Amino acid sequence: MNPKNLLKIIEEVRKFDDQMEAQAIAVFFYVGTYGYNDGVLMQQIQKDLSLGQSSVSRNVYKLADINRHKKKAIGFLYTFDDPMERRRKKVSLTSKGKRVFNSLKDLAS
């Protein structure tokens, strides 16, 4: 990816939250890339991005509709129980998240 395109992507994401950290952006792009339709397991995000469970949870909630303090958040992601194993959580894009992801994906190319 062209570094100029990467900077454009970061600028666009930060329009939603000017304090958004690189980890949160990485989680958003991971979910958009690997869990666009069916979602992705939180454990898989941990493993593939080499993040701890608390880091993944914190970043997912920053990007969700409601954060962990029960306040309105960005609204890019939502979590749900894995239908195959209810103890596991999956993460997917909201319709807003899909719109933003698609527009950012276009910037990357």
Model segments located where?
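Short, Lys/Arg-enriched N-terminal segment that forms or immediately precedes the first helix
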Residues: 2-18
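Amphipathic alpha-helical dimerization/coiled-coil segments
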Residues: 11-12, 98-109
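N-terminal helix-turn-helix DNA-binding core of bacterial DNA-binding proteins
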Residues: 14-52
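Short polar/acidic secondary-structure junctions
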Residues: 18, 82-83
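DNA major-groove recognition helix of helix-turn-helix
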Residues: 60
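A short, conserved structural fragment
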Residues: 64-82
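Basic, amphipathic "hinge/linker" alpha-helix immediately C-terminal to the N-terminal HTH DNA-binding motif
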Residues: 83-101
